[in-house]
């Protein structure tokens, strides 16, 4: 079985654009304040360079990332779960006072201009994942053999 390909330039390869542009969800692994690991599913947007996701300051996810910015995201192709980009890096937070971050996610996933579920007083932040390494995995055919989907190895 071939190893995943490193993109070497910290960019998602074009062969995986459909995964990050689609209405798929990311699994975000992070470190909790006590040193144990946590993994959460998040909705996200990708701007062609960075993956961004949103959370409330009251959530554990925010507390985890405020203490340790290291993350690993995996976004699986729902039709072929062995095909995915993995993005490792640091999640940098910005206040989302104008709600543009969460509203862009609402537009992508709900086709709504404004995210409808925040309550008065909710403090929202957007995390931008600055990649340190990106890997892109192959598709595995139904017979179990790997298919090369055009990722160059070097």
Per-region residue spans from a language model:
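Charged, gly/pro-rich active-site loop segments
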Residues: 1-11, 83-154
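Short, basic/aromatic recognition patches
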Residues: 2-26
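Hydrophobic alpha-helical segments typical of transmembrane helices
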Residues: 12-16, 61, 101
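Short secondary-structure boundary/capping segments
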Residues: 17-18, 43, 63, 117-119
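Short beta-strand segments
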Residues: 23-57, 63-65, 71-75, 84-86
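Short, surface-exposed beta-strand-loop junctions and turns on beta-sheet-rich folds
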Residues: 59-61, 80, 143-144
């Amino acid at each position: 079985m071939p190893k995943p390909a490193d993109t070497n330039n910290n960019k998602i390869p074009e062969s995986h654009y459909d995964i990050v542009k689609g209405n798929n969800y990311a699994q975000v692994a992070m470190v909790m304040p006590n040193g144990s690991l946590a993994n959460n599913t998040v909705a996200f947007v990708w701007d062609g360079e960075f993956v961004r996701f949103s959370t409330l300051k009251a959530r554990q996810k925010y507390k985890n990332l405020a203490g340790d910015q290291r993350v690993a995201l995996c976004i699986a192709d729902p039709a072929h779960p062995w095909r995915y980009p993995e993005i490792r890096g640091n999640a940098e937070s910005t206040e989302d006072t104008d709600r543009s971050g969460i509203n862009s996610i609402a537009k992508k996933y709900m086709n709504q201009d404004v995210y409808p579920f925040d309550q008065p007083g909710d403090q929202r932040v957007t995390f931008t994942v600055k990649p340190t390494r990106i890997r892109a995995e192959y598709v595995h055919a139904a017979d179990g053999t790997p298919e090369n989907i055009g990722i160059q190895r070097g």
